[in-house]
UniProtKB/Swiss-Prot annotation:
Pfam families: Baculo_LEF-10. It comes from Orgyia pseudotsugata multicapsid polyhedrosis virus (OpMNPV). Involved in late/very late gene activation. Keywords: Activator, Transcription, Transcription regulation. Belongs to the baculoviridae LEF-10 family. It comes from the Viruses. InterPro entries: Baculo_LEF-10. This is Late expression factor 10. The keyword Transcription regulation applies.
Amino acid sequence: MTHVLSAAANDLIACVLRDNLFSADGECLRYVVCKEAGHVESVYIGEIGAAQAHSGDQNAVLDASSASDVSSSASSRRVS
């Protein structure tokens, strides 16, 4: 089953990810879930190589952690 997103949905996703997705070490993706003065809370999403390996297959779905795994892998770092 294929899900087609509307242009508005695509724009919303792009806007959310634009300033909140980053690579901490060049090998993994993290999504910012909380920004406070001088402090960033992020969640590990996956390895960049895994995403690139699936990029040619439009129907590929990356393995996702359960909610408990995601929350347990949350990390913090200081913003310079």
